[in-house]
């Protein structure tokens, strides 16, 4: 019988990668001779990958990009980010304890992220967390990505988990919409990378610290989903 599973988003959910993403974004903006972005600006641009982040940051300074320049800046961004992994990125408070809690309760753990798979694997490895995850699926692991629900359901399949006893944990509308489309309950963290409060997207529950992500909460939400 397949085991229950918790599937986490990565950036802004499990790991606070904002300082490194911001550094890499500003590295690419400097190549366009644009003003560096602060943390508040970063939150307006993040959430859909590096390409969209770069486009939004340029648009905010009334600068358009052709395809070739966009590709060049994305490569600068990705190379800078990859070369500095793990940089300043660290797990959010309570993450390590939550991992131990769910492992003790017999849950599988997985990651479903729109970060590139190689960078996701490198980050988790650099932080010493790889052994805890049965699957780590990035935006290029499959032929589809969040908010396509197959990204989540295929991550669960890859991990060997039970989709009828699954819970998603994320920080964005994309995560919430993905889980809903898959028929899987979703807990939203309210400390991630979005400029709107996650309650607006109607997740199954909202937490402000990983201490609140208890086995009891997970089991209650999974039961309520009616699988």
Swiss-Prot record:
Residues of the signal peptide: none
Top-level taxon of origin: Bacteria
Pathway it works in: Organic acid metabolism; glycolate biosynthesis; glycolate from 2-phosphoglycolate: step 1/1
EC number: 3.1.3.18
GO cellular component terms attached to this protein's record: cytosol
One of the record's GO molecular function terms: phosphoglycolate phosphatase activity
SUPFAM superfamilies: HAD-like
Entry keyword set: Carbohydrate metabolism, Hydrolase, Magnesium, Metal-binding
EC primary class: hydrolase
GO BP field: carbohydrate metabolic process; DNA repair; glycolate biosynthetic process
Entry annotation: catalytic residues: 9 (nucleophile)
Catalytic activities: 2-phosphoglycolate + H2O = glycolate + phosphate
InterPro entries in UniProt: HAD-like_hydrolase_sf (IPR050155), HAD-like_sf (IPR036412), HAD-SF_hydro_IA (IPR006439), HAD_2 (IPR041492), HAD_sf (IPR023214), PGP-like_dom2 (IPR023198), PGPase_prok (IPR037512)
Named cofactor requirement(s): Mg(2+)
PANTHER family in UniProt: PHOSPHOGLYCOLATE PHOSPHATASE
Similarity comment: Belongs to the HAD-like hydrolase superfamily. CbbY/CbbZ/Gph/YieH family.
Function per UniProt: Specifically catalyzes the dephosphorylation of 2-phosphoglycolate. Is involved in the dissimilation of the intracellular 2-phosphoglycolate formed during the DNA repair of 3'-phosphoglycolate ends, a major class of DNA lesions induced by oxidative stress.
Name under which the protein is recorded: Phosphoglycolate phosphatase
Organism: Mesorhizobium japonicum (strain LMG 29417 / CECT 9101 / MAFF 303099)
Gene: gph
């Amino acid at each position: 019988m397949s085991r229950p599973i918790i599937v986490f988003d990565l950036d802004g959910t499990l790991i606070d990668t904002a300082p490194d993403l911001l550094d890499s974004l500003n590295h690419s903006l400097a190549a366009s001779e644009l003003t560096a972005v602060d943390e508040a600006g970063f939150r307006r641009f993040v959430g859909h990958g590096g390409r969209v982040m770069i486009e939004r940051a340029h648009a905010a300074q009334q600068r358009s990009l052709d395809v070739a320049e966009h590709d060049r800046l994305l490569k600068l961004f990705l190379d800078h980010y990859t070369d500095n992994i793990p940089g300043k990125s660290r797990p959010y408070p309570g993450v390590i304890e939550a991992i131990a809690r769910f492992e003790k309760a017999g849950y599988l753990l997985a990651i479903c992220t729109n970060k590139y798979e190689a960078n996701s694997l490198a980050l988790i490895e650099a932080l010493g967390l790889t052994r805890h995850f049965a699957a780590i699926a990035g935006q290029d692991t499959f032929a589809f990505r969040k908010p396509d629900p197959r990204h989540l359901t295929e991550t669960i399949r890859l991990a060997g988990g039970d989709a009828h006893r699954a819970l998603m944990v994320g920080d964005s509308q994309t995560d919430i919409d993905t889980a809903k489309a898959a028929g899987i309950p979703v807990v939203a963290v309210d400390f991630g990378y979005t400029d709107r409060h996650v309650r607006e997207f109607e997740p199954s529950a909202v937490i402000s610290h990983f201490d609140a992500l208890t086995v009891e909460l997970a089991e209650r939400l999974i039961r309520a989903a009616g699988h």
